[in-house]
Amino acid sequence: RIVAMAKMLANQILTLVIGPSLSKINLWSPSAEELVLGTAIVESGLTYLRQWGDGPALGLWQVEPSTQSDLYTNFLNYRPELGTQLMELRAPNLSMDENLATNLMYGAAVCRLCYYRKPDALPEAGDIEGQAAFWKQHYNTPLGKGTVTKYVYEVSQVLKEA
């Protein structure tokens, strides 16, 4: 029952949030969509809006405020059109941190931009092991607690029912 609920939630987040969000910043592709969904599954279980414990990470994609700040300072400041597209997803009455925590379209776009700024090509759609390795290297980082095995297992559990 829990897996069925996670599958339903994953399908809704994919259709109502991730797809439209990535399209609005002109960075949609099947592989990007899958990677952003997989990231939400493994980072928050599609459940947590604030990092479990004492950590600073926010939203389904568990982005740290310092990562968001760096994205603007060292990446979007040099790509004003992309920065404007992201800001159009932002809820203006919320702080940047509140947007990360509660604005799903904004959070999905920030996650995608975290991957976009890396020079490596995204793994192909359907390549969960490749996506897991890409997530570990570029998002969770080598020092992060996540593992490729955990990504593959958790994402497979949700997506095998889809």
Predicted region positions:
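Alpha-helical scaffolds flanking conserved acidic
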Residues: 30-38, 126-135
